[in-house]
Amino acid sequence: MFDKRVLNQKVWLGFLALHEVFLNAFEYQISARVGSFSRIAFNQSVINSKKGIYPTGSYVTTTGALQVDFSLLPKGIENHKLGFGVGGEIGSLAYDSTKFLIDEADPKAGFQPANWYYMGRWEGYLMQHSQNWTREQKAQNARPYVLYNLYLDYQYKDIFGIKLGRYPSKALFLSGFNQGFELFYRWKKFRIEWFSTFGRALANEQSIRDFYAPVNYKQKTNYGMHNLNLIYENKYIRVVPFIWFYPNNFNAPGFEITHDTKSYWKSDWRIQTTFYAWFPLYSDYLSKDYYRASLIGKKSAILFVFQRVHFRSYRFGWSVYKNFGNGSAQLGWNGSPVDPFYDTKDDTPYEDAYSNFYNANSMTINAFIGKSIKNLLVQLYGKLTYSPRADSQSLGVTFKYNLKKHIYLMLMFNGYQITMHKGYKVGFFTSGYNPDFAQTIQNRSYLMSSMSYRF
């Protein structure tokens, strides 16, 4: 009689031999992280939707992520690269201050939870349930997990490359993770890039969100948002004419001009100055709708200029962002060049978390100064936003500390006040000025912290 133990031994030995061959032929990297994020808000008011009164909302998350990246070509091949990766994250709300809140103006509407917005938001891939689900239903249908990485990446030298699947996005107007593809071709000092997205996801300690269509307006088909860049760059200047578009919704031509002293000025100083302009042009049917209580209209424009200065361990800078018309109605709230400078989504989740930075005809002024001390970064920043709908002011300080090699800590305090002008109301976006809405002033100050262990 055949001994099954011998067979099992041979199978395992064969598997180990193949595993050893694979390790010798290919490279791979395993990375993981566990962490927690918290936002403790100072405003824990009741909800009164009739008056436009809402709390800021406090919450605490716990998250864990695992990722594996492979190089699929033998180690001896130098000019060609072929990569594959898979990664996912799961999380939960350890605390949610909004879980059992009731609307004073409409008690029969049931509980009004809101922090599912950060941990597991899911209203359908096409956002088809955003209007017909209650807040409680949205909390019940939350998906605090996502397979954020599943990609194939080919590159020939620095001349040509293509990447497709799910992977981290570096696109100007898409933060988080992309579900789509991109490619580039370089010739001398020119580089052409194409980017297509059919889904966006978030995966970090603060937010988990499964892939959804980043732009889809009253359509049952996602046509994708697309981008073409033509980049010219030398050691003095970078010039990028570009266009972003979504079929049947909008076309947004624009350009970037950047001057950076890093490549030619050998000094303790580094000065980077960038100017962006883009011009969203909306379709006829979209132009008749409202975004953040303002008519979208046909034409709009956005100007953004910033300057960053580094001197030894110091850094400081400023920026100005100006909306002409309703430029953010389709492009910008899924990511924008502003994102590295300050958080544009730190309002109450009852306002979709978006700050008044996105309002029509708004102007936002920002400044910061910081210093690095070994593994500690301290940064002071301020932000002023003015718009017909609302004004806001914030002043905050952030501490970031890398403890040893794998542990990262962050602590932030932000004093933040929003004045909603007469005629507008928090959380009300579907029509324009209404004289029955009274002015409100609400405190949106918060304390944020995060900790993570990564390897």
Regions found by a protein language model. Give the residues of each.
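Short loop/turn motifs that connect adjacent beta-strands in outer-membrane beta-barrel proteins
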Residues: N24-Y28, S71-F84, D158-I159, K189-R191, ...
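Cleavable N-terminal export/targeting peptides
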Residues: M1-E27
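Transmembrane beta-strand segments that form the barrel wall of outer-membrane beta-barrel proteins
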Residues: I159-A171, G176, F181, I192-S196, ...
